[in-house]
């Protein structure tokens, strides 16, 4: 009986982790591309500012606090699943870390690769999609694996959602 209950807990944590990783990778790639575009050619100033604020706030606050804010403030008046709230909170949290991982991967690619894309007649988007991102992805794959492991460990705190005694 106890092992069956633990199996359900493990399945739930794994489910939260998988969906949070998917959300985190989507957010992370978007934020990383905005930040890298700004770093390379100074474009997207307003979006870059919003992304910097997002990164600073999310990376600067504890995950537990983010989970509590998401559940007790953002989704307080809506009747949603606690798993959905956990996926949203951990996905947004993971997105900040994935963004910096991917941005560092993009910035690690030699400037000559950008110039090679330009010499082939590619615009910036084509250069990023066809030349830079495949190389950056190879470079950041180990760090993304580490982020998934960290996220799997962090999802254990999702059990605190709904425990009112801790917030009194």
PLM regions with names:
Residues 19-55:
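Transmembrane-helix boundary motif in ABC transporter permease subunits
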Residues 1-6:
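Single conserved hydrophobic/aromatic residue that forms the stacking wall/gate
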